[in-house]
């Protein structure tokens, strides 16, 4: 089972305004839908405010984290269920052993809670290169996430601003990472200060060495 997160952010790191998306980007909504439905038996995880904003999303199991909402039912063969905590949710998922991918879709407190528990393997970020008026912002990614890939859409938001689809991957202990074409990309501007001692092996210019995230400084943009 994979635990991933997906979010769209603006140039000023905003993700919401008045509990809604501050922009309309059909391309990104299709991207979100295709990923979260995907193949297999997938579920989305959201907080109460996100649930109030987007409602129940079809063709996926919907899990809502809330201390005040309490319901559980099946709709079109998909489970709609609330949980009071991440621990309760994970216990249920582990006991059922019935899910291929879990997708965390917001809001900001939910992202941060899962990051603090080191539960997110892949983080899918749609970056819209434009400033928006926002009242909710994305929390910082820990510095032990490496950029796995970045694709720039051939289309422009408002015919002016670029749309970037970026995937970050969490470094695991003793992980071997191979960098091709002498290119290594690190998260530099968005990070937490409390970095864990995660040792892993890197291969760079056909040479291997063991390092940890504190001393990984051979990066290029």
Model-inferred region functions:
Residues 174-180, 202:
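A short beta-strand micro-motif
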Residues 181-184, 207-209:
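Short acidic/polar mixed-charge low-complexity motifs
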Residues 183-192:
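Short beta-strand-centered aromatic/proline hotspots
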Residues 196-201:
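Short aromatic-glycine-enriched beta-strand elements
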Residues 204-221:
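Intrinsically disordered, low-complexity, charged/polar segments
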């Amino acid at each position: 089972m994979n635990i991933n997160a997906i979010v769209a952010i603006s140039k000023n790191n905003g993700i919401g305004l008045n509990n809604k998306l501050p922009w309309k980007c059909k391309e990104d909504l299709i991207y979100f839908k295709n990923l979260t439905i995907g193949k297999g038996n997938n579920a989305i995880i959201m907080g109460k405010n996100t649930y109030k904003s987007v409602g129940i999303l079809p063709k996926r199991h919907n899990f809502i984290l809330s201390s005040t909402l309490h319901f559980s039912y099946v709709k079109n063969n998909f489970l709609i269920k609330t949980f009071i905590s991440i621990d309760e949710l994970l216990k249920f998922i582990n006991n059922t052993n019935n899910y291929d991918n879990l997708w965390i879709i917001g809001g900001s407190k939910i992202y941060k809670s899962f990051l603090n528990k080191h539960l997110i393997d892949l983080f899918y970020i749609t970056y819209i290169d434009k400033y928006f008026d926002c009242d909710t912002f994305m929390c910082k990614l820990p510095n032990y996430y490496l950029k796995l890939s970045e694709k720039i859409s051939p289309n422009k938001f408002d015919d002016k601003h670029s749309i970037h689809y970026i995937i970050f991957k969490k470094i695991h202990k003793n992980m071997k990472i191979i960098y091709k074409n002498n290119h290594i990309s690190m998260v530099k501007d968005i990070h937490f200060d409390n970095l864990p001692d995660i040792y892993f092996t890197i291969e760079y210019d056909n040479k291997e060495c063991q390092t940890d995230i504190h001393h990984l400084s051979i990066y290029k943009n």
